[in-house]
């Protein structure tokens, strides 16, 4: 756990016509969302607040993202290196290289967001959207079982493999 991570930024529409930007980091070993931050702007502050939630890997870790401007920024790259991660970037314009976190974003929206909010009438404030995201991450990590994890939740799976 904690050695191979993927990250991306997705966004949710707000009632005032703006966006809630959501930065997430997923552990490829456990499936757990290990970092999450929201912002009214897609900027370096969002990316850095997300990184600040990470623990350094026990051995050299890999941190994979797309080639978005947040991730190619030297400040971001330096912070990753300082944390003990080697940076890995998707091929330009190839979303399939980051499919695991892209898939999570889609799952979050389909399971949690779209059923609760009519697409024709986005009625979320930024605070509502931030709360919504944190609730889903908690649900996903602690309650949502996954077949590939032996029908355990990501947190149960992490506990199981770290006890052995």
Listing of model-derived features with the role each one plays in the protein:
Residues 1-164:
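Charged DNA-binding/catalytic regions of mobile-element recombinases
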